[in-house]
C-alpha cells in the first residue's frame, strides 16, 4: 500500500505535530503531509519554543511561522492514508472522531525505543529540545520506511 497522504496528530496542534509535519514534509516531497490536533487550539500559532528549536536546528520556518492550529475532523481522517500520533491515547481519540481511521493510525515513535512522544506544552526549553530530537528521529525513520 502506498501512503501518499500523511496526517500527523497531537493534542493541541501547536507543538509536536506541526514540528513533525515540517520535519517530515521535505523528506517526502511527493506526499501530502499535514497536521491537526484532537483538542486543537484552532487558529493558534505554533508555540514560540517550537519556532525557537526549529530555528536552532536550521529548519525552514516559513510554514511554522504561518501555522494555525487545526482541529482533527472525520473528513481529515478519511482523506489520510496514514495517521501518525504522538501518544497511545491519541489512537483512541482519533478512532472516537472517525472509527474507520483506527486501522491506519500508528504511533509516530513506533520504530524508536520510546513509542510515546511526550507533550512539550508549557515545559522548559530543555524539554522541548529533548522532544525535538525524539520527533526528528521518528520522522527520519518513517521517511525511510515510506520512501517510494
Which sequence ranges carry the predicted segments?
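Short polar/charged helix/loop
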Residues: 1-148
Amino acid at each position: 500500500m502506498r501512503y501518499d497522504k500523511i496526517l500527523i496528530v497531537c493534542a493541541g496542534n501547536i507543538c509536536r505535530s506541526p514540528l513533525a509535519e515540517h520535519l517530515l514534509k521535505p523528506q517526502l516531497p511527493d506526499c501530502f503531509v499535514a497536521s491537526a490536533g484532537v483538542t486543537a487550539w484552532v487558529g493558534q500559532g505554533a508555540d514560540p519554543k517550537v519556532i525557537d528549536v526549529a530555528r536552532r536546528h536550521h529548519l525552514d520556518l516559513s510554514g511554522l511561522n504561518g501555522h494555525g492550529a487545526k482541529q482533527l475532523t472525520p473528513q481529515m481522517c478519511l482523506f489520510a492514508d496514514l495517521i501518525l500520533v504522538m501518544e497511545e491515547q491519541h489512537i483512541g481519540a482519533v478512532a472516537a472522531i472517525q472509527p474507520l481511521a483506527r486501522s491506519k493510525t500508528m504511533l509516530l515513535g513506533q520504530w524508536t525505543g520510546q513509542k510515546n512522544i511526550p507533550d512539550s506544552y508549557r515545559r522548559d526549553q530543555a524539554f522541548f529540545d529533548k522532544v525535538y530530537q525524539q520527533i526528528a528521529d521518528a520522522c527520519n525513520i518513517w521517511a525511510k520506511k515510506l520512501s517510494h
